[in-house]
């Protein structure tokens, strides 16, 4: 068995030909703005990956999904990060459809038409209030008039739909609640402008999306949970679990790409190689443990707490493994190929995704002493 063999086999099983295309395309091409990676993913049927077969999807379970993200991350970190945002958005729609909603119609359209869904939820907010709405919404007889800005927004230039968090009137008539507005990218009120300036993850299309007074019909607005900005309902909890799971797999893939290069170097001692492999494989085992629990426990805050603890442990594993892999690869590899330096930079992205460790230290310790989990 080779490192990443299992993950690449799952990628080939669900999205035939994609791994080969990514492998034969240079990292420089895949990681630049305007990367062909997103189109490759779409053409391979990737938008349907986590959509159940009953909704015309491919029906990948959480374990297969996270392995596939790791495989993609080892070829193109940008593509792995970008597609995680699609899968995260779709997974929430799957849960809503399972509750008897009409979301199944949208899921069938996403799967059959290979539509990409971008997430307009509050990543990258300096105040850290990641559950607070990213958009303002005004109630009208026809639906909601939505306006706002999301930056960065992965898949900004390839998306077919944007999911945006908004405040909507409560279904029980008692106050407001959070909701998700589904906004077609073709609406004249939706525009995309440059935002991402870093060389790292440039292929993820993480630019600015502006929504200007877009009318969203009521049937494309889905109430989700409380509007207090801290506590989650079951749908939000499950969405966060999926988000953390797939992001961990994506960045572990990028880290493993460096390990894969290092263990191929003859002069590196077996003991050093084993240390690198142990680091990434132990981290992946912890991630897969979360994935195995998702079918029965994804709505449970306990699993989300476990996912966050594993996520911060994965960050530490990456921080330990990657510098050592770069050192063992040596100066010649670093100087003669951009790939080593690029991967070493890209893996740091995991620590920037919400919720940050420093923000969650207090809430997690409160949770571990008996309080409900809140998201900071």
What is the predicted function of each stretch?
Residues 149, 168, 193-198, 241:
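Glycine-rich, charged/polar anion/phosphate-binding loops
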Residues 149-187:
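DPxDG-like acidic metal-binding loop motif
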Residues 331-376:
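Glycine-rich phosphate/cofactor-binding loops in nucleotide/flavin-utilizing enzymes
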Residues 196-281:
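Glycine-rich beta->alpha junctions and the first turn(s) of the following alpha-helix
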Residues 16, 253, 274-284, 308, ...:
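Generic structural signal for well-ordered, non-transmembrane alpha-helical segments
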Residues 68, 146-148, 211, 255, ...:
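Buried hydrophobic positions in well-ordered alpha/beta secondary-structure cores of metabolic enzymes
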Residues 19-29, 263-267, 282-316, 323-334:
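C-terminal helix-coil-helix/basic helical segment that borders enzyme active sites and/or dimer interfaces
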Residues 33-43, 48-154:
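Glycine-rich flavin
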